[in-house]
Regions:
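Solvent-exposed functional surfaces
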Residues: 82-214
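Short alpha-helix boundary/capping and kink motifs at helix termini
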Residues: 1-90
């Protein structure tokens, strides 16, 4: 290995990957958070094998301590019905307890969360029905779903999804129709507060609220 390659290795974690049965993993360290049974049950009910990440493990004194993936192993155990089930683990052999705790505490410090718009557009690319239906409905009014506020654009993506999920397609359709007819695509008319308010009005009053007198 030449000198340059050795220098580059400084930026590569010294780990190896193993499949380890869940029963051989320990996640009761004091720095660990409490296990959320509700989260485990919800994730298990919507289990997707391709969303399972490798579990990060510190091997100390022959014991496999989980410092990232506590809920993952419980989800897999619940879905598979066995703690004999193996999971892929990214194993560190050179950590001490305080390093594990520090990594656990700061693991999300520089992680950039996905924005609702980014999630929505990825679901479009994946061909997921809900997002395709919402996009087509929005575009039927000559509007677009956008990442920021602009004329004729809707950036309140989470609100569109929430209205669709809570009240249904026809309420979302009417909300958009009323906004377009009343404010003609003005950006503020598609704010989260405005969309939610009209959805609640429609839910409360239904057909007694006339479009032409809105």
């Amino acid at each position: 290995m030449d000198g340059n390659t050795e220098d580059l290795q400084k930026f590569v974690p010294q780990v190896h990957f193993e499949q380890i049965p869940i029963k051989n993993l320990c996640s009761n360290q004091d720095y660990q958070r409490n296990l959320s049974i509700k989260h485990v049950q919800r994730a298990a009910a919507n289990f997707d094998l391709y969303q399972i990440n490798p579990v990060k493990v510190s091997r100390r004194d022959g014991i496999n301590y989980v410092f990232n993936g506590q809920h993952t192993i419980e989800i897999v155990a619940l879905v598979s019905g066995s703690r004999e089930t193996p999971v892929w683990c990214m194993v560190y052999d050179d950590l001490v307890y305080t390093q594990e705790a520090d990594i656990f505490a700061n693991q999300m410090k520089y992680v950039k969360s996905l924005l609702p718009y980014e999630i929505f557009m990825a679901n479009i690319e994946a061909g997921n029905d809900r997002e395709l239906i919402i996009r087509d409905l929005v575009e039927s009014y000559d509007l677009t779903i956008t990442s920021s506020s602009r004329p004729g654009g809707i950036c309140a993506v989470s609100t569109l999804i929430n209205i669709y999920e809570k009240y249904g397609f026809h309420t979302l359709d009417r909300v958009l129709r009323l906004c377009v007819a009343t404010w003609e695509g003005a950006p503020m008319s598609f704010s989260s507060n405005m969309l939610n308010a009209i959805a609640r009005l429609d839910n409360a009053y239904g057909e007694t609220m006339k479009d032409d007198t809105f």
